[in-house]
């Protein structure tokens, strides 16, 4: 994928064409082999800088084994529908900085449950060539029937009569999450992996730890601590 020049407000028509081209690269297909590691990725903002983090988990023990982060100016200004172009390059770099390449990504955001079928999980999956799942706390598109109250209950998320994900109850009597495949995985597999990595909380453990780690780095940055070795050059 060609890099996007940072800090430049793009031509929206060109950006939309780029998004449509990349969306054609998304492949929803069964996993090739059983993943052994999974990385949660998330981003936070500290002033004008983005904090992009990746936390690698061992899937068998569901324990963190590595983590990395990048601090940089966002690649683009915020443009509705194009969040992945703002955060994706930095999150991808955080994943690349992990000591081991993950077998699977769980992304705090959407996969194909997106107006253009190209959410943040799709962007990262395509750019990195890694199976990716979007696990969002709120719906972006689509309609659904509320799943039953028990953990593991799910219903399809439908957009224009197309199944774009699942509405999944990861904890009994707690609000569901919106799971959608991003790349190289099916809806059913994405649901199974989210349930497998959820341990007593609403969100998967890799996603929770990525959120916590991003908040920690943000707090330290705002307190004036320097991380010059992790900042991307403008």
UniProtKB/Swiss-Prot annotation:
Q: Name one Pfam family in it.
A: Endonuclease_5
InterPro entries associated with the record: Endonuclease-V (IPR007581)
Annotated site (Interaction with target DNA), which positions?
78
Reaction(s) catalysed by this chain's protein: Endonucleolytic cleavage at apurinic or apyrimidinic sites to products with a 5'-phosphate
Protein's cellular compartments: Cytoplasm
Entry binding sites for Mg(2+): 42, 108
- In terms of superkingdom, the source organism counts as Bacteria
Report any one BP term from Gene Ontology. Answer: DNA repair
User: Which parts of the chain span the membrane according to its record?
Assistant: none
GO MF annotations, alphabetized: deoxyribonuclease V activity; magnesium ion binding; RNA endonuclease activity, producing 5'-phosphomonoesters; single-stranded RNA binding
Instruction: Identify the enzyme class.
Output: hydrolase
- Name any cofactors this protein relies on: Mg(2+)
Annotated GO CC locations: cytoplasm
What residue range is the signal peptide? none
Q: What is its EC number?
A: 3.1.21.7
Keyword annotations: Cytoplasm, DNA damage, DNA repair, Endonuclease, Hydrolase, Magnesium, Metal-binding, Nuclease
Q: What does this protein do?
A: DNA repair enzyme involved in the repair of deaminated bases. Selectively cleaves double-stranded DNA at the second phosphodiester bond 3' to a deoxyinosine leaving behind the intact lesion on the nicked DNA.
Give the similarity note. Belongs to the endonuclease V family.
**What's the protein name?**
Endonuclease V
Q: Which organism does this sequence originate in?
A: Geotalea uraniireducens (strain Rf4) (Geobacter uraniireducens)
């Amino acid at each position: 994928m060609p890099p996007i020049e940072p800090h430049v407000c793009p031509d929206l028509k060109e950006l939309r064409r780029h998004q449509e081209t990349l969306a054609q690269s998304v492949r929803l297909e069964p996993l090739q082999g059983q993943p052994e590691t999974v990385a949660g990725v998330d981003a936070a903002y500290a002033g004008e800088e983005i904090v992009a983090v990746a936390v690698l988990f061992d899937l068998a023990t569901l324990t963190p084994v590595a983590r990395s982060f990048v601090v940089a100016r966002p690649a683009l200004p915020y443009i509705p529908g194009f969040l992945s172009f703002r955060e994706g390059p930095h999150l991808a770099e955080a994943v690349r900085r992990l000591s081991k390449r993950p077998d699977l990504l769980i992304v705090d955001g959407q996969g194909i449950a997106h107006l253009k079928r190209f959410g943040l999980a799709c962007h990262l999956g395509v750019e990195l060539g890694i199976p990716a799942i979007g696990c969002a706390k709120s719906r972006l598109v689509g309609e659904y029937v509320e799943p039953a109250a028990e953990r593991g209950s799910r219903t399809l998320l439908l957009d224009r009569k197309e199944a774009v994900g699942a509405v999944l109850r990861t904890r009994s009597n707690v609000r569901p999450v919106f799971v959608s495949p991003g790349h190289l995985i099916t809806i059913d597999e994405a649901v199974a992996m989210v349930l497998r990595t959820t341990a007593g909380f609403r969100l998967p453990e890799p996603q929770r730890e990525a959120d916590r780690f991003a908040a920690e780095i943000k707090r330290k940055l705002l307190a004036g601590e320097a991380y010059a070795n992790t900042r991307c050059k403008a």
